[in-house]
Amino acid sequence: MNNLHLICNAHIDPVWLWEIEEGVAETLSTFRVAADFCDDYDGFIFCHNESMLYEWVEKNDPVLFGRIVRLVKEGKWHIMSGWYLQPDCNIPCGESFVRQILAGRYYFLEKFGVEPHTAINFDAFGHSRGLVQIMKKAGYDSYIFCRPEPDMLDLPSDTFNWVGFDGSKIACCRAYNSYESHRGEADEKIKGWMELHRGKKVGMVLWGIGDHGGGPSRIDLKKIEELKNSEKEFNLIHSTPEAFFEELAESGEKLPDYSGIMNPRYTGCYTTMMRTKQIHRKLENELYMTEKMSAHALMANVSDYPSEAIEKATKDLMLVEFHDILPGSAIEPVGEYAQEVAGHGLTELRPEKIKAFLALCSDKAKAEDGTIPVFVYNPHPYEVDETVEVEFQLPDQNKNPALYSVPHVYSGGVEIPCQREHEVSNFNVDWRIKTVFFAKLPAGTMSRFDIKMVLCENPQPPVQPEGDEFVWNNGKTKVIVNLKTGLIDEYEADGKVGLGKDSL
């Protein structure tokens, strides 16, 4: 008989149509029920992923956590995938995917002594091709996903080799008819797969109540057992993702190659909730900048490394990358929660970034009188051509309205092009200065630039007030602005009045 691997899971969205507190409670409830089923039913295997959820259990119910450790050792509970959570698989940068994998892998290896080699992202809305080489180099040889579905993306087969940009390959399976089954309907889902795949040597079906947790039910296990006893072509076995792919490889089935991305699905999610996407990218950039500067300062023996702050900020980043938070497909309170989580990460990083930055500046020469030193750090392992914006305070206010301060920027004693722009402040005194200059920043280096100020004659604007009005007239267009109200009193073009007094 041909084997059909039944993989029982309980997809738990930490947040979605509910908030994080409910996600924690549902995780505990689902894991308790699943542990009972593992003890009560011989041959049954429960599969679950996401180390963040296991951390919740470890913190809030140590006894249950101990049961799960025992069940994993007994082969009744399978640690699946081994990521921190199921993130959005399009928006994060490559390094963020690496962190999702490493955080989960380290946790499961430490707590359970396991290293899964099949990755899963059941509920993500698409998958970047760049994931292939990341997963391959992280120790994965296979991948299970559900979206995009067959009506959204035509693949050469539902089991295939996904080829990455660097030529890496991993075996993939697009799961049949989603990752879950409704209560009492798992057998119907299994029958549906068998009807479509008569003659197939090896197959896989995901089942279990999901989204808001749930997992197995007694009625489903009863019906599956009845189906198992009556089915003549397929041997139904409770199994794991790794067991399925191992048998698939041994079956001799030649898998076709696919070298594309796996998109699109729910494309509107990638054009909405911009606040979440913006603060995610800000946290992402601040985390990796702070981490690199801190590591540099440690190696230079000028500062220690802020491991605790980096770990906290990394977990905040990974949570914001959850596949219903970052795309913006959750309820409004979840969007507000994302701002809180990302804000916490930024708050953790800020003092550490300041500390590392100042430490890396500590060996720089003292500035000469009248010179304002500016330091710019390039965290990248390559030279960067960058437009640098900087604000600084003059030692004293320029109170002469006939003069204004002009910055001159020098790099290694050579003057480089720059320009003064309006500072963020609207404080109407020549005291706070913003300048912009173009710079070449060497890789992994703290670069120094020196600014010297020159007082220049303040040019007079060509148009002067006429009483209580500003009047611009070039012969074709005439505009009159009321100095008392700031409004346009008159607008005329080619002799035609567009706006008259009191129009606004």
Residue ranges with predicted function:
Residues 1-373, 412-416, 435-447, 491, ...:
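Catalytic-domain carbohydrate-binding cleft regions of carbohydrate-active enzymes
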Residues 401-434:
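Solvent-exposed beta-strand/loop surfaces of large extracellular or lumenal domains
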Residues 377, 424-426, 436-440:
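Beta-strand-rich interaction surfaces with strong enrichment in secreted/lumenal proteins
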Residues 380-407:
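Surface-exposed beta-strand/loop patches in extracellular or lumenal glycoproteins
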Residues 351-388, 460-474:
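Surface beta-strand/loop "capping" patches
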Residues 214-219, 235-238, 420-429, 459-465, ...:
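A conserved amphipathic helix/loop scaffold
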Residues 383, 452-504:
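Beta-strand-rich N-terminal accessory domains
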Residues 6-8, 18, 318, 398, ...:
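Catalytic cores of glycan-processing enzymes that make or break glycosidic bonds
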